[in-house]
Curated annotation (Swiss-Prot):
Domain of life, per lineage: Bacteria
Keywords: ATP-binding, Cell inner membrane, Cell membrane, Hydrolase, Membrane, Nucleotide-binding, Transmembrane, Transmembrane helix, Transport
Membrane topology: Single-pass membrane protein
The protein's name in its UniProt record: ESX-3 secretion system ATPase EccB3
Organism of this sequence: Mycobacterium tuberculosis (strain ATCC 25618 / H37Rv)
Entries under Gene3D superfamilies matching the protein: Type VII secretion system EccB, repeat 1 domain, Type VII secretion system EccB, repeat 3 domain
Known function: An ATPase. Part of the ESX-3 specialized secretion system, which is important for iron and zinc uptake or homeostasis.
Similarity-based family: Belongs to the EccB family.
Biased composition range(s): Basic and acidic residues: 1-16
Induction (UniProt): Repressed by IdeR in the presence of iron and by Zur in the presence of zinc.
Length: 538
């Protein structure tokens, strides 16, 4: 290689921006990696550029201070701050836009949060969002605008439904769970007084000392003010405590405790059953037309084999002698019949299993009227809370009612009770317990287990008020124009009228009522109660 060629290659390598990083460790024959410049080369180039700029601008290349670099950093920070502000403003405009009235039907004043609804060319002040949605016919949300934007429209009269709910958030539960409790002297959650009628919506809490379902053979003896009743197996049966044939047959004994007073709200929520009296048997005392050693109306017995899973034992079965045959009865009904008239028999005549099999079978008596085993009464001094729990899972054909008893209300910890101002007026409950912030879209049904859900539609709020819904049909079961406007999702949750009637009656939610104009609103004539500024009632 000539010196001229060597100088040309050296000059090319010196002027190129290729990396001069060696890729081998042989000092005799160094091979350089070809590629981009290294970080050290870049920082060195930047330093040279700053030094040249300092020499031109400051006439000093010593660079004891570097004011030009401080200025560039300040400019960069300013640009970053401006960009951050622009991004923040964009995000804020998405979260809280400065709305325009446009074609929006429901508007809200940004400064006062007052609601307005457009009807035709006029802008009407509206009492609440529920009324505005009924007027518009769909569940719209208000568009927040400035007051100057609202002043551009001609103003109309005040319209809306006084007392309509401000917020209607439907509870996600589709199962019907309604509980009515009556406490004599029971603390509710948080130590509040639990005396009176309490309506609970949703699943119950039955842990600890809270009211739980009555056990087998348990019952509650109550006084409704018009008679004595026995609460058992999800129903209430009239009972005469002076009829010792019945009380003894039920296992109450001679010393029956005084019945507890029951509130009408709980009393009406429990379905009525036939009275607990000795059944009337036709031709009682006459000889039977079939071969039994007892007259009609008497009781006979027989032994039957019972398989308990581990052992097989003999059990006594009782039969009532009826005009057309024998009917198997429970020990309680057998005791009631014998206490009423044993027909001179010290013991029920015993028949063989083969003899019973040959005799005709009768079904004259309604054995469901009577408990299948002797009952034990709940000690109301220890368990002063009595409840009726009505439930119907979604899709179920029948409902069920369970009686509860305990020392405290079965209110879940996450649910707080609301004391009703109109408690006791027109059968209104003392308090309600619903999940805060949600309500129930309901439909009334009968109290019976097979009652169909074809009643009126109601909205039950978390403050204990029931609002009737104008259910103008629209082709969907449980749905209508008002239901669609309010944004409610069918199907409604069934609720017995005996439970629904315990809520405070509110106005009907309909478009016709929402379009009523007002000059002013008269004070509420219903009972009121002042609330202190610190919270609670005075």
């Amino acid at each position: 290689m000539t010196n001229q060629q060597h100088d040309h290659d050296f000059d090319h390598d010196r002027r190129s921006f290729a990396s001069r990083t060696p890729v081998n460790n042989n000092p005799d024959k160094v091979v350089y990696r070809r590629g981009f410049v290294t970080r050290h080369q870049v920082t060195g180039w930047r330093f040279v550029m700053r030094r040249i700029a300092a020499g031109i601008a400051l006439h000093d290349t010593r660079m004891l201070v570097d004011p030009l670099r401080t200025q560039s950093r300040a400019v960069l920070m300013g640009v970053l701050i401006v960009i951050t502000g622009l991004i923040g403003s964009f995000v804020f405009s998405l979260i809280r836009p400065n709305g325009q009235a446009g074609s929006n039907a429901v508007l809200a004043d940004r400064s006062t949060a007052a609601l307005y609804v457009r009807v035709g060319e006029q802008l009407h002040p509206v009492l609440n969002l529920t009324s505005a949605r009924l007027i518009v016919g769909r569940p719209v949300s208000p568009t927040t605008v400035k007051s100057t934007e609202l002043d551009q429209f001609p103003r109309g009269n005040l319209i809306g439904i006084p007392g309509a709910p401000e917020r209607m958030v439907q509870n996600t539960s589709t199962d019907a769970n309604w509980t009515v409790c009556d406490g004599l002297n029971a603390p509710s959650r948080g130590g509040a007084d639990g005396v009176g009628v309490t309506v609970i919506a949703g699943p119950l809490e039955d842990t600890g000392a809270r009211a739980a379902a009555l056990g087998p053979g348990q019952a509650v003896l109550v006084d409704s003010g018009a008679g004595t009743w026995l609460l058992w197996d999800g129903k209430r049966s009239p009972i005469d405590l002076a009829d010792h044939a019945v009380t003894s047959g039920l296992g109450l004994g001679a010393d029956v405790p005084a019945p507890r007073i029951i509130a009408s709200g709980l009393f009406n929520a429990i379905p009525e059953a036939p009275p607990l009296t000795a059944p009337i048997i036709p031709d009682a005392g006459n000889p039977a037309s079939f071969g039994v050693p007892a007259p009609i109306g008497a009781v006979v017995s027989s032994y039957a084999l019972k398989d308990s899973g581990k052992t097989i034992s003999d059990t006594v079965q009782y039969y009532a002698v009826l005009p057309d045959g024998l009917q198997q009865i429970s020990p309680v009904l057998a005791a009631i019949l014998r206490n009423n008239n044993s027909y001179g028999l010290q013991q029920p005549p015993r028949l063989g299993a083969d003899e019973v099999a040959k005799l005709p079978v009768s079904r004259v008596l309604d054995t469901r009227r009577y408990p299948s085993e002797p009952v034990s009464l709940v000690d109301v001094t220890r368990d002063p809370v009595t409840c009726a729990y009505w439930s119907k899972p979604v899709g179920a054909a029948t409902s069920s009612l369970t009686l509860l008893a305990g020392s405290a209300l079965p209110v879940p910890d996450a649910v707080h009770t609301v004391e009703l101002v109109g408690a006791g007026n027109g059968g209104v409950a003392t308090r309600v317990a619903l999940a805060a912030g949600t309500g129930y879209f309901t439909q009334t049904v009968g109290g019976g287990p097979d009652a169909p859900g074809a009643g009126s539609l109601f909205w039950v709020s978390d403050t204990g008020v029931r609002y009737g819904i104008d259910n103008e049909p629209q082709g969907v079961a449980g749905g209508g124009k008002a239901v669609e406007a309010l944004g409610l999702n069918p199907p409604p949750v069934p609720i017995p009228w005996s439970v629904l009637s315990l809520f405070v009656p509110g106005p009907t939610l309909s478009r016709a009522d929402a379009l009523l104009a007002h000059d002013t609103l008269v004070p509420d004539s219903r009972p009121a109660r002042p609330v202190s500024a610190e919270g609670g009632y005075r």
